[in-house]
Amino acid sequence: VLPEERLATAAHWTAKSLEIAEYFEDARMTSYVLRMHGNELRKANLRGAAVQRLCRAAATAPDDTARAAALPLLARAAGALGNSALFDRVMRETEGLLDSVDHTSLFNPFSLHEIRLRGLVSTGRTRVAMQLVENSPVPTTVVAPQWRVIELVTVAHVQLLADDRTGAARSLDIAIREAVTQRLPHQLQRITRTAGTRLPTQHSTASQLLDRIRREMAA
């Protein structure tokens, strides 16, 4: 929920938490903190370090439940890094656990669909992403509300790559409303980048609302 300019702070403090977790030599706790720290590193664009921490989180996980919590984050980081081989391997393993591990706000078919779309684009397989973009699973109650916003922005990005400006504008309009309701400045920043110069109305609206949230956070 932090704007991008504050993400480095989150990465710093989760690193401090890792030092504490490792002291207790508890595999589950260490895996949890590693995945939180790795995810913050990814959001701060420290992608190589993120993949390293998230690989450790998956390796440290004491059971399939803990591993299923780490793997989606590792897939996101591997995709962002452009490592297609690691991304594909982790996605296969993650999807292989869907029938045997309870679903969570991150580990579920809806969230994994978004992760796959984004990873395919990041690893140079835009055409495959275009073929999958309309096949999003129906979100269930286990899906966290912010994941709907995350997915809408990713879908809009793929729609623009397919030159579907009407569909992308519709996706971003919904994402903007939800991002404001849920107070998600980072997603508004993603929206402005996605809209760019091709969707000036959505870019302007998201920018204005982002400025408003920043002022409220600074008050």
Q: Which positions does each model-derived feature cover?
A:
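Conserved binding/catalytic microenvironments
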Residues: V1-A219
